[in-house]
A protein has these predicted regions:
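Membrane-embedded alpha-helical bundles of multi-pass transporters/translocases
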Residues: 1-178
């Protein structure tokens, strides 16, 4: 559960950290980031609301697979999308609905770890187990910041004054890092 949570946090934070850079330098309309973020917010909240209904019908393993498939499909669509808000928006919805499902499932997996520990060892160590989550969130944020910083330097975005100053190779580096 801890490794899954760490990878999820790094991926999620890396993707969201690049949002404004993508819309400014690749999409070339920084103002559309607000629209995109609103779409993602509604998608993620909707996913969190429908989670209980879906979780009653399918197993956690199937649900995790579904969430992962949605995220992967969203990333592929995002990478292949032309610079149009409709396909990019659809890709974002797929990514953030899948991530919302995974986020809740990881919390359930942590809870399962606590229950298993109590069953197996006769001790309930929820404080220790749950204290790992903030540590993972901080480490994930730090790794994501490192990825973002390296990407902005290597892609040339850091020194670009305008979106037109970024080469097509630099934009490809940005999309790959996201």
């Amino acid at each position: 559960a801890v490794i899954s949570m760490a990878l999820f946090t790094i991926g999620y934070t890396t993707t969201t950290s690049f949002g404004t850079y993508f819309f400014k330098y690749a999409f070339k309309d920084e103002g559309m980031y607000g629209v995109f973020a609103a779409i993602l917010g509604v998608a993620q909240i909707t996913a969190l609301v429908i989670f209980p209904a879906i979780s009653k019908k399918i197993s956690r393993k199937t649900f995790y697979t579904l969430g992962t498939a949605l995220v992967l499909a969203g990333y592929v669509l995002f990478f292949l999308s032309p610079m149009s808000i409709v396909p990019i928006g659809i890709a974002g919805v797929l990514i953030f609905v899948g991530e919302a499902f995974i986020q809740l499932l990881i919390l359930m997996f942590l809870s399962d770890t606590i229950e298993y520990g109590q069953w197996k060892l006769g001790k309930r160590n929820q404080a220790v187990t749950l204290s790992v989550q903030p540590l993972i969130n901080k480490l994930g944020g730090a790794v994501a910041t490192g990825i973002m910083t390296a990407t902005l330097l290597v892609s040339g975005i850091n020194s670009a004054k305008t979106p037109d100053d970024v080469t097509s190779e630099g934009l490809m580096i940005l999309k790959l890092a996201m």
